[in-house]
């Protein structure tokens, strides 16, 4: 008699579990949609958040410049919410991938700023998974895919300052510190070394942010001011609105007529779809351009900068605003990495 083992029940159980798991992951009825990208997103963002909070509070000083002069960024080392930061990885590490097992010990890993790479890489991949999850959820619901396209703007902006710029400059120590004052320091140093304020791509980004804020405020105020009254005068207008109602809740023709007469006729949209596409496209495209500008400057490709001095036919300098900006940049460069070199490369 042969010894036999019936595997059908085992396979059926496995398939049943796997089917239930897939059904739960891909269900659009859950209070929080998970999706395939969510399996990657949730642990990555949790790890990045926990590591960031722990480093912001407890991390020891980091030898950011690679000259054995560590800089403290944690709250327990005397910083406050404004001055605290997760300090970028040491210049001695460069752009090498630096997980904890590459160091001789945990203390050395902390001293060389390994937490910065840990937080940044987990965050970028987690945010990328979030963008993929937006596409996946839209696909499941039969929606058009423009939500994840819009989110690509902040994602590429973060990738530019946290990944592309350090790679282009040859060291993660040139990445943006993860803190408030560290962000401002990064901006000043970036201006000193690249004069980004004079770059047209950065100007497009400024127009995107301030223009987007203006358009958002204009749109919100116009809609709120042209709500259709469905209630008596002594009741709130909000009571007359039912979630999911098919009838429009505000008069776009009234808003269009008001704004067209306030500015001029063609400054106002009479098509709701065109209006909302414009509100989405304006800031997204501008942030794309800014990210492209940062990414090109990462490799010192500054050819689009309008910072050249003006010289007359005799070779004499004609003082201009570009010279004032260049002089200010040199002043900021002198303050940067003050112990790593005596003079900035521009003056050496």
UniProtKB/Swiss-Prot annotation:
Keyword Glycoprotein: no
CC terms in the record's Gene Ontology section: chloroplast thylakoid membrane; photosystem II
SUPFAM superfamilies per record: Bacterial photosystem II reaction centre, L and M subunits
Cofactor, free-text remark: The D1/D2 heterodimer binds P680, chlorophylls that are the primary electron donor of PSII, and subsequent electron acceptors. It shares a non-heme iron and each subunit binds pheophytin, quinone, additional chlorophylls, carotenoids and lipids. D1 provides most of the ligands for the Mn4-Ca-O5 cluster of the oxygen-evolving complex (OEC). There is also a Cl(-1) ion associated with D1 and D2, which is required for oxygen evolution. The PSII complex binds additional chlorophylls, carotenoids and specific lipids.
Binding site for chlorophyll a ChlzD1: 122
Membrane topology of the entry: Multi-pass membrane protein
Annotated keywords: Calcium, Chlorophyll, Chloroplast, Chromophore, Electron transport, Herbicide resistance, Iron, Magnesium, Manganese, Membrane, Metal-binding, Oxidoreductase, Photosynthesis, Photosystem II, Plastid, Thylakoid, Transmembrane, Transmembrane helix, Transport
GO BP annotations, alphabetical order: photosynthetic electron transport in photosystem II; response to herbicide
Residues passing through the membrane, by range: 33-50, 122-137, 146-160, 201-222, 278-292
Residues noted as binding chlorophyll a PD1 in the record, renumbered to the chain: 202
Broadest EC class assigned to this enzyme: oxidoreductase
Site feature location: Tyrosine radical intermediate: 165
Residues reported to bind a quinone: 219, 268-269
PROSITE patterns: REACTION_CENTER
Function: Photosystem II (PSII) is a light-driven water:plastoquinone oxidoreductase that uses light energy to abstract electrons from H(2)O, generating O(2) and a proton gradient subsequently used for ATP formation. It consists of a core antenna complex that captures photons, and an electron transfer chain that converts photonic excitation into a charge separation. The D1/D2 (PsbA/PsbD) reaction center heterodimer binds P680, the primary electron donor of PSII as well as several subsequent electron acceptors.
NCBIfam families per UniProt: psbA
Note: 2 of the reaction center chlorophylls (ChlD1 and ChlD2) are entirely coordinated by water. Herbicides such as atrazine, BNT, diuron or ioxynil bind in the Q(B) binding site and block subsequent electron transfer.
Subunit description: PSII is composed of 1 copy each of membrane proteins PsbA, PsbB, PsbC, PsbD, PsbE, PsbF, PsbH, PsbI, PsbJ, PsbK, PsbL, PsbM, PsbT, PsbX, PsbY, PsbZ, Psb30/Ycf12, at least 3 peripheral proteins of the oxygen-evolving complex and a large number of cofactors. It forms dimeric complexes.
Full protein name: Photosystem II protein D1
Provenance organism: Heterocapsa triquetra (Dinoflagellate)
């Amino acid at each position: 008699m042969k010894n036999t083992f019936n595997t059908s029940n085992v396979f059926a159980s496995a398939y049943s579990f796997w089917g239930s798991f897939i059904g739960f992951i891909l269900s659009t009825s859950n209070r929080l949609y998970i999706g395939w990208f969510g399996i990657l997103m949730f642990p990555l963002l949790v790890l990045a958040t926990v590591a960031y909070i722990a480093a912001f509070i407890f991390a020891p000083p980091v030898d950011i410049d690679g000259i054995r002069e560590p800089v403290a960024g944690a709250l327990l080392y005397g910083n406050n919410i404004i001055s605290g930061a997760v300090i970028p990885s040491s210049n001695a590490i460069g752009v090498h991938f630096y997980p904890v097992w590459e160091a001789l010990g945990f203390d050395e890993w902390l001293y060389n700023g390994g937490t910065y790479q840990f937080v940044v890489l987990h965050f970028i991949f987690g945010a990328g998974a979030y963008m993929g999850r937006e596409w996946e959820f839209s696909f499941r619901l039969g929606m058009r895919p423009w939500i994840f396209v819009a989110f690509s703007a902040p994602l590429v902006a973060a990738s530019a300052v946290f990944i592309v710029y350090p790679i282009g400059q040859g060291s993660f120590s040139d990445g943006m510190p993860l803190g408030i004052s560290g962000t401002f320091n990064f901006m000043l140093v970036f201006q000193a070394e690249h004069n980004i304020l004079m770059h047209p791509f950065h100007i497009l980004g400024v127009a995107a942010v301030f223009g987007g804020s203006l358009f958002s405020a204009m749109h919100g105020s116009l809609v709120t001011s042209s709500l259709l009254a469905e209630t008596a005068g002594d009741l709130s207008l909000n009571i007359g609105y039912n979630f999911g109602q098919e009838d429009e809740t505000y008069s776009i023709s009234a808003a269009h007529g008001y704004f067209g007469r306030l500015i001029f006729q063609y400054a106002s949209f009479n098509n709701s779809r065109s209006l909302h596409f414009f509100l989405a496209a304006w800031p997204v495209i501008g942030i794309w351009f800014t990210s492209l500008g940062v990414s090109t400057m990462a490799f010192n490709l500054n050819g689009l900068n309008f910072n050249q001095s003006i010289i007359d036919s005799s070779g004499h300098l004609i003082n201009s605003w570009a010279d004032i900006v260049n002089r200010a940049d040199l002043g900021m460069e002198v303050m940067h990495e003050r112990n790593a070199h005596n003079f900035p490369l521009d003056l050496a």
